[in-house]
Amino acid sequence: MRLTQLVHAIDLHAAGEPGRVIVGGILDVPGKTMFEKMKYFERNLDDLRLRMLREPRGYPAANCNVILPPTDPRAAAGFIIMEQTEYAPMSGTNTICVATTLLETGMLKMIEPVTEFMLEAPAGLVGIRAECKDGKVTKVTFKNVPSFAVHLDIKVEVPHLGTVTVDVAWGGMFYVISDAAQFGLKVTPDEGRAIQPSQNAPEERRRRGHRQARLEQSRHLDRRDRPLALRHWHRGEDGDAPCPGQLGLNEDFHHEGILGTVFTGRLVEETRVGPYQAVVPTISGTAWITGMSQYGVDPSDPFPNGFKVGDIW
């Protein structure tokens, strides 16, 4: 066996969303903040992202994280988030996967019934509250970065779909959110093949600087016709909460993924980010470890950084 660039990783999923976590084989990188370290990865180590997320080591829904020493002394660990198209400053499912990895592998001491600590994401410090029982992290609640709506009900032109009404919100990265009903679709597993073209529209999103697209469908309403639960097209959940001002402070909101798995969100304070009225949410969910792996590159491999084929990409 001839393997170079060997890394050690924990494979997990958070409510169905894959979130691989590299725990060994990567030394610290230059940068005074975790954001600067993320930019260093982007400029100098992007082959790692390609290698871990493309076939044969990854697939389109895969995510990967790298645990690094924190730059802020208040944090127990730092981490870099690598997604299919970019490096995300913040991600809900990846945060839950990283917190679960640190505790369940013993990298951080688990204290039952609750372990509290800080993580340093590229977007800033993230407070973690992990509920633990019998060596298992049963629920992770984290306090996210301030989130805000940039646009509500704007019209965009999408190839093969025409004029589409969307919202644009920031929750650690920009999300373009649209109602599945305008496409005549329901957010169910059997609609997946029809939904995917509606969710992609990459050229228009990238032209406007918006990275992720989500199709949403309201599931349950309260007496004032506000959504209490939302379903969206994603294997798991993330930090991409709804944004039209329909949720008050300290009210639970259940965000359901395509698999029926649920994260619980809550707005805990109001703030401002530049010209935008913003809120600070907490998000709760669970991750499960599925494997522990070593990945490397054979020097004779014709695809050292992986590959993409049009059948599923």
Q: Model-found features: residue ranges?
A:
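A glycine-rich beta-to-alpha transition motif near the start of alpha/beta enzyme domains, typified by
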Residues: 1-167, 176-313
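Glycine-rich ThDP/TPP pyrophosphate-binding loop and its adjacent helix/strand module
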Residues: 172
